[in-house]
Structures are given as structure tokens and as C-alpha cells.
Amino acid sequence: MNKNNVIDSLFNIIEDRKDKPIEGSYTGYLFEKGLDKILKKVGEESSEVIIAAKNEDEEELIKEICDLTYHIMVLMVEKQIKLDGIEKELEKRREKICNKKNERKTIEKL
């Protein structure tokens, strides 16, 4: 299975769990609990990635990055953001000649 197919397949499964919940599904549980729970998990997993990177354990870091990626994808489905939207934005950023930090848009509201 190529790299994109793994990501696409997982994303499709997450979308399916949102549309057709399965009893006992962790993904379904996250959607049932709602945005606050999903965001809490994204925050937790982000912290775990940072700790794993600091510990310099590649296997642990890979696992934590996978956990974070999964929870980000759950958030994307919850907020109705498609993978192709992310791909298009990454492509636009890749095409920029200069992407200095001081030239980025500022966050206007939190």
C-alpha cells in the first residue's frame, strides 16, 4: 500500500465512523463526546510528541506522531476539513519562493 493510500484509507474510516458509529469504536466515542474531547486529545498527543522527541527514542516518537496524526484527522472530520484541502494548502506553501516568518499572516482571534 502506498503512503497516500494509508492516509486516505484511515481518513475514510474516520469519516465512516462519524457517519455510521459502531458501538465500542474509540473513534465513535470521540465524536460522541464532541469537539472539546477531540481537542483535549490533540493537545495531549502534541505534548507526548514533544516529550518523545526530547527522549530521543525513535520508535516512541514514531508511535506518538501516529497518535497525533490520527487525532488531527478526527479533528479534521469533526470540522469538515478534507484531506485535499490540506494537500492544496501544502502545495501552495511549497510553491512560495519566500516563506519567512515575518511575512506570514498574524492570528487575529483565538
Swiss-Prot record:
Protein name (record): Phosphoribosyl-ATP pyrophosphatase
Pfam families: PRA-PH (PF01503)
A GO cellular-component term linked to this record: cytoplasm
Alphabetic keyword roster: Amino-acid biosynthesis, ATP-binding, Cytoplasm, Histidine biosynthesis, Hydrolase, Nucleotide-binding
Family indicated by similarity: Belongs to the PRA-PH family.
One of the GO biological process terms: L-histidine biosynthetic process
Organism superkingdom: Bacteria
GO molecular function, one term: ATP binding
EC number: 3.6.1.31
Annotated localization: Cytoplasm
Record field: catalytic activity: 1-(5-phospho-beta-D-ribosyl)-ATP + H2O = 1-(5-phospho-beta-D-ribosyl)-5'-AMP + diphosphate + H(+)
The protein's annotated pathway: Amino-acid biosynthesis; L-histidine biosynthesis; L-histidine from 5-phospho-alpha-D-ribose 1-diphosphate: step 2/9
